[in-house]
């Protein structure tokens, strides 16, 4: 179910846009619950639309693995302030030691944290999205034009598409 907020877009278009934004922005704040408070940290997302999942490489020594094991509902906050594009995703996370998936996700950036994909401390956190909310700007030029038009007409500008997506 989608609340389109007068975007003129279908649920399918909005879902596709949420996936596209997450894939484009790539780095998100991965937010867990430790039983007392939320904990956030930046992680690189690996989007797998076919599997309807978002994967993250993580280290077994981190606290987030324990938090995910106890409280699997997590939030992912993707933010591109320069282009005014944002997507927040909530879903269920699970930790895996799937060595084949780790090798598939391995890239040169991971080398900053581990020597190789064979490092026994690497784990995968897979998040299956349950719902999302996106805010999407048409871009700086269009936003500037909308603000100028608003200044001339006295009407509030519509600068961002906003939509809540349930059961994505």
Model-flagged regions — what are they?
Residues 1-29, 152, 161:
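Extreme N-terminal tail/first-helix region
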Residues 2-8, 120-168:
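C-terminal edge-of-domain segments
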Residues 5, 64-131:
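Short, structured beta-strand-loop surface elements
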Residues 12-15, 61-62, 108-110:
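Charged, amphipathic alpha-helical segments
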Residues 22-26, 71-72, 128-129, 158-160:
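A short, compositionally biased
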Residues 25, 40-42, 119-122, 160:
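Short beta-strand-initiation
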Residues 26-61, 66-68, 74-80, 86-90:
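Short beta-strand segments
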Residues 46-47, 92-95, 139-141:
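A short, sequence-level motif marking secondary-structure junctions
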